[in-house]
Swiss-Prot record:
GO cellular component: cytoplasm
Residues in the signal sequence: none
GO molecular function, one term: S-adenosylmethionine:tRNA ribosyltransferase-isomerase activity
Gene: queA
Top EC group: transferase
Keyword terms: Cytoplasm, Queuosine biosynthesis, S-adenosyl-L-methionine, Transferase
EC number(s) on file: 2.4.99.17
Catalytic reactions on record: 7-aminomethyl-7-carbaguanosine(34) in tRNA + S-adenosyl-L-methionine = epoxyqueuosine(34) in tRNA + adenine + L-methionine + 2 H(+)
Pathway, per record: tRNA modification; tRNA-queuosine biosynthesis
Organismal lineage: Bacteria, Pseudomonadati, Pseudomonadota, Gammaproteobacteria, Legionellales
Stated name of the protein: S-adenosylmethionine:tRNA ribosyltransferase-isomerase
Gene3D superfamilies given in the database record: QueA-like
Record's function text: Transfers and isomerizes the ribose moiety from AdoMet to the 7-aminomethyl group of 7-deazaguanine (preQ1-tRNA) to give epoxyqueuosine (oQ-tRNA).
Amino acid sequence: MKNQWKTSDFDYNLPVELIAQRPLADRSGSRLLYIDRSRRTVSHRQFNGFVEQVKPNDLVVLNDTKVIPAGLFGHKQTGGKVECLVERILSKDRFLAHIRASKAPKLGSQIIIADNFKIIIEGRYNDLFECVLHSSASILDLLYQHGRIPLPPYIQREPDKDDQARYQTIFAERAGAVAAPTAGLHFNEETFDALRKKGAAITYVTLHVGAGTFQPVRADSLADHRMHHEWMEVSKAVCDAIAKCRKNNGRVIAVGTTVMRCLETATKNGECRPYAGETDLFIYPGFQFKCVDALLTNFHLPKSTLLMLVCAFGGYELVMEAYQKAVENRYRFFSYGDAMLIS
């Protein structure tokens, strides 16, 4: 194992036409690349092959965050255009946001949305602005009236009505994410029925995915990278389900890198403990996993923290080999793309 990992170690060549621009007609119609760590093999399947790999007493853990229409367009008092991406809702009228304008807004300046809603800039924290909405409506009301789904930057088109449904898991409950936990997008009701018939248990954590998930790693060395913060919650019910799974010799299966980060954040000294708060856990090769036994995930961007996490779990050489095979076999990549299972 290398002592000094570099961002460039996680680069790979991806033809642009393999980046999925739209979802498949059938949520569960994706392909599945399966990595067996013990045998060091890579095989090609359909997504229903995921259920085939689940065993009785396994615990499938999903992220129930709900994507909000976090993109707002407005203007300054001077008339200049402003684009606002809500990163985190702090209260009914207070939130943190990324703001794009011809000039960075000053503290105390105003942004007008839809001619009726006034937002005042009250603070700045690195790339984020703290904003207050002056209205009888809440920020969520404003977003659901005038916001739009913030598709990832690699989807080169405007969001449409299909995205409102398809860039959302069918089990989304808790509003607050600006990006979907994409491994969960493959699940439909038939998937859940099949899991229950296999004798698997199902439970949910929450991690509100932030825009930082798309930010590039700017440091050359991973040791110098500062991970973005995201809000998460692992309940006592989840911890109890994990304890029961262990008692019955089952496996904990994380559906997505967000679930992985939740569970590994909440596990201390071999025990999952209830936790609600921030996580900036950065998982890369050399990390000692304490909770998760199998991971279902999508394919991730070159040099991204998500790919680094997958390499940490699946083994660097095996995962990078699998990515090369995925490219050769024309898998669909990123949010609307195909899936990978590592066990």
